[in-house]
């Protein structure tokens, strides 16, 4: 009559029955809560699987779009070739005898009659050849029908050469990875079944469904990776190899639409030292760069005629940037695409859709911007339960106990460990390319700092207890002023003592007095280079009386700031069309300039002459720093190398090779450590003698500038992801993080370590006060 699970009535005197105790009720509530928690966890896992599946489907869509676009181009190309050959034949035929003319005309007509049977036979033969090639390379292939759906393809226009080759390549790629994919699926299915058998709270049907979804996601993932590699190879034919480092441009992403564009050679800076195509003969361009406020994937145009912002097809690079439909917390999404007539070498233009193939699709966060400037100490109360956070994010925990203890001692909140801008919905994706076992530490806190040993072994860094405490370590930074420069700010520097800030944009440097709160206009403007050329670097001599400016021109301008009105004291002319970075020796006698041709020019400032050139970089030299004692120089280049130079002997000392272009670097004033900012979004901290290094993973896109504090205990980096990150030297504990509204291209720290200035793509510089 009553349900079996009905709770017993309270015990009354004189009646036999169970004793009512609070402990039993609490246990029952606890059991029910654990059951609900397990159900919630399984639903969360299923939701994550579906989200991953959706991501992979979107990538597949992009991949097929890219493939169809490529085939369409190839078809038009082959059609045009056929028309031209026809014209040539028609012109040559009259020179033949009458008899030969008829034979040739008949042969031409026969050649035009390609039937579907012949076409299918040709495709079948190509697939057979692909199978033989696959057999020779990867062992016996898995049989594959001529068409992915098992049907014969519909009529295709008769094409020759590389178009049919592309079809064969597709068939080969599909067959080559099927066997590997199936084997991996079996392993993963077994693993999921073993996992589900140990989970009492999930029903068998749920386990089976989860394993099926897991296998489907693995299929998508393997296929997407393989197809990305195939597309990169097959589409590279559309690119020429002529792109070199002097073709670097700046994209003013926030420029008013009504403003007429200047010559294509002076397009504004896009983030990440992107190289431009076809601009070599027009003008030097340069490596810093600027992005849109919504961090849309940058684009590269093949044709200068398509240099319009809103219509340029193309793609940026392998750097992960958020999709336009998923704005980062605290930023406003700007409609429209930001075009960028530049690219790093080896990137292939096929359409803006292609960039999503190389771009993780992020989900929006529900956490707003105010978290951006909170210190980690203030954030530690958020979601401190390790099991709650691990359950929420389905995070694997295979880290060492030492790392766990260190993380607990460090006390970094889960939210801040992704940057104080909200949760990352897929923590293991945060550290790009890392195995899932390295993506988090016990307790569900994602790792972002890793120690890389000499043999390449990567381990999360256990932070010491004083990682965020102690003398000279800031707690956070607060924004105190905004300097509206009016153009993209590619270079900033602060005077010593801290009073003036110099901001370099298009064709001029503006001087601001930050000692007066609320100052909204510059006190002076230094017009240099050409009006449309961007300034890439400006450096003050230690006495504060001389400013050296370099950028998209072959000349460096030396300004005398001590005169009643600043004036040009001298100009230094080099053979390179652009200067990307400057450094001044501690004794202020020598200036070093990074040239777009890869050379490092050494200038005697007293005699205003070129005294030496360091040659070694095979592509543009993009960044530079000098040791505190003035004996060693460090340079980074677009040739993926960092080199050190002995200034006394004038020779190269060391060379570090990377897999990514180098956009920024800084040498610790106290010696030993060199921090390097990559196009791949990593920051790497190298020891000047030991092979060990640290790898830091909080940026989501190109790391565009980097600067050490003068005490050497911390440094800051800025990126295309709109972030300013402050790191502990050398292991990279995140001290604080600030989110700006656009790409942050440049930064500087005052000599007393009390102020930070950044220059960004939304035409302003921002002054921060460092709070200790």
From Swiss-Prot:
Entry-linked CDD domains: WD40
One of the GO biological process terms: regulation of DNA-templated transcription
Positions with biased composition (Polar residues): 310-322
Keywords in alphabetical order: Acetylation, Developmental protein, Differentiation, Isopeptide bond, Nucleus, Phosphoprotein, Repeat, Repressor, Spermatogenesis, Transcription, Transcription regulation, Ubl conjugation, WD repeat, Wnt signaling pathway
Cross-link (Glycyl lysine isopeptide (Lys-Gly) (interchain with G-Cter in ubiquitin)): 720
Stretches the record annotates as Disordered: 130-163, 184-347
Start and end residues of each stretch annotated as Q domain: 1-131
Domain observations: WD repeat Groucho/TLE family members are characterized by 5 regions, a glutamine-rich Q domain, a glycine/proline-rich GP domain, a central CcN domain, containing a nuclear localization signal, and a serine/proline-rich SP domain. The most highly conserved are the N-terminal Q domain and the C-terminal WD-repeat domain.
PANTHER family for the chain: TRANSDUCIN-LIKE ENHANCER PROTEIN, TRANSDUCIN-LIKE ENHANCER PROTEIN 3
The protein, known as: Transducin-like enhancer protein 3
């Amino acid at each position: 009559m009553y349900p079996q699970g009905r709770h017993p009535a309270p015990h009354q005197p004189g009646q036999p029955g169970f004793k009512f105790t609070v402990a039993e009720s609490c246990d029952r509530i606890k059991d029910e809560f654990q059951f609900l928690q397990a159900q919630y966890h399984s639903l969360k896992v299923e939701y994550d699987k579906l989200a991953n599946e959706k991501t992979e489907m979107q990538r597949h869509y992009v991949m097929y779009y890219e493939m169809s676009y490529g085939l369409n181009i190839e078809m038009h190309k082959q059609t045009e070739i056929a028309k031209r050959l026809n014209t040539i034949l028609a012109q040559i035929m009259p020179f033949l005898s009458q008899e030969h003319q008829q034979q040739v005309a008949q042969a031409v007509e026969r050649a035009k009659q390609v039937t579907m049977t012949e076409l299918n036979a040709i495709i079948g033969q190509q697939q057979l050849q692909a199978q033989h090639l696959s057999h020779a390379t990867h062992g016996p292939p898995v049989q594959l029908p001529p068409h992915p759906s098992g049907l014969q393809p519909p009529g295709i226009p008769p094409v020759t050469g590389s178009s049919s080759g592309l079809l064969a390549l597709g068939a080969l790629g599909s067959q080559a990875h099927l066997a590997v994919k199936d084997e991996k699926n079996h392993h993963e299915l077994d693993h999921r079944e073993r996992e589900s058998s140990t989970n009492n709270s999930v029903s068998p049907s749920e386990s089976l469904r989860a394993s099926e979804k897991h296998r489907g996601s693995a299929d998508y993932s393997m296929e997407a990776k393989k197809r990305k590699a195939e597309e990169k190879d097959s589409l590279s034919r559309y690119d020429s190899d002529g792109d070199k480092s002097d073709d670097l441009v700046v994209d003013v992403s926030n420029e008013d639409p009504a403003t007429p564009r200047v010559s294509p050679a002076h397009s504004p800076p896009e983030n990440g030292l992107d190289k431009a195509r076809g601009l070599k003969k027009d003008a030097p361009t340069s490596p810093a760069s600027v992005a849109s406020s919504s961090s849309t994937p940058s684009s590269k145009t093949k044709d200068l005629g398509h240099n319009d912002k809103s219509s340029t097809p193309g793609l940026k690079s392998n750097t992960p940037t958020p999709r336009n439909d998923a704005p980062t917390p605290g930023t406003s999404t700007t409609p429209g695409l930001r075009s960028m007539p530049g690219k790093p070498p080896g990137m292939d233009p096929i359409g803006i859709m292609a960039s999503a193939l190389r771009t993780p699709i992020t989900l929006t966060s529900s956490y707003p911007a105010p978290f951006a400037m909170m210190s980690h100490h203030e954030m530690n109360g958020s979601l401190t339960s390790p099991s709650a956070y691990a359950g929420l994010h389905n995070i694997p925990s295979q880290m060492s106990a030492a790392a766990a203890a260190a993380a607990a001692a460090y006390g970094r909140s889960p939210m801040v460990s992704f940057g104080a801008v909200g949760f990352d919905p897929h923590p293991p994706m945060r550290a790009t390319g890392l195995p899932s076992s390295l993506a988090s530490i016990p307790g569900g806190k994602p790792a972002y700092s890793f120690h890389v040993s000499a043999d390449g072994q990567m381990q999360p860094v256990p932070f010491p207890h004083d990682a965020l405490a102690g003398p000279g370590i800031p707690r956070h930074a607060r924004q105190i002023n905004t300097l509206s420069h009016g153009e993209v700010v590619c270079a900033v520097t602060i005077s010593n003592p801290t009073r003036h800030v110099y901001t370099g944009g298009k064709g001029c440097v503006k001087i601001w007095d930050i000692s007066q709160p609320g100052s909204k206009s510059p006190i002076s403007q230094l017009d240099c280079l050409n009006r449309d050329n961007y300034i890439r670097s400006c450096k003050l001599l230690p006495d504060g009386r001389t400013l050296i400016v370099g950028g998209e021109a072959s000349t460096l301008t030396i300004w005398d700031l001590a005169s009643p009105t600043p004036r040009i004291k001298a100009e230094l002319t080099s053979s390179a069309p652009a200067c990307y970075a400057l450094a001044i020796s501690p004794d202020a006698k020598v200036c070093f300039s990074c040239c777009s041709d890869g050379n490092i020019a050494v200038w005697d400032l007293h005699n205003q002459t070129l005294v030496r050139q360091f040659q070694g970089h095979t592509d543009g030299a993009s960044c530079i720093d000098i040791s505190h004692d003035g004996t060693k120089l460090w340079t980074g280049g677009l040739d993926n190398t960092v080199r050190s130079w002995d200034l006394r002997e004038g020779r190269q000392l060391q060379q570090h090779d990377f897999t990514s272009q180098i956009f920024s670097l800084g040498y610790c004033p106290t010696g030993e450590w060199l921090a390097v900012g990559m196009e791949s979004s990593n920051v790497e901290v190298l020891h000047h003698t030991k092979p060990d290094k640290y790898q830091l993973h909080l940026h989501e896109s190109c790391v565009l500038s980097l600067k050490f504090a003068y005490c050497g205990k911390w440094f800051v980096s800025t990126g295309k992801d709109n972030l300013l990150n402050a790191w502990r030297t050398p292991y990279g504990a995140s001290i604080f993080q600030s989110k700006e509204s656009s790409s942050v291209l440049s930064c500087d720290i005052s000599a007393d370590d009390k102020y930070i200035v950044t220059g960004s793509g939304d035409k302003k510089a921002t002054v921060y006060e460092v709070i200790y």
